[in-house]
Amino acid sequence: GRLQAFLAKMKEIAAQTL
């Protein structure tokens, strides 16, 4: 669902930030 996509996006951004 959208929540999974949202969490995946956050993880992706976090990975790039850290």
Curated annotation (Swiss-Prot):
According to the UniProt entry, the coiled-coil residues are: none
One GO cellular component assignment for this chain's record is: extracellular region
Keyword Secreted recorded = yes
Q: Name one GO biological process term.
A: defense response to fungus
- Which residues constitute the signal peptide according to the record? none
Q: What is its main location?
A: secreted
What is this protein's record name?
M-lycotoxin-Ls3b
Organism whose genome encodes this protein = Lycosa singoriensis
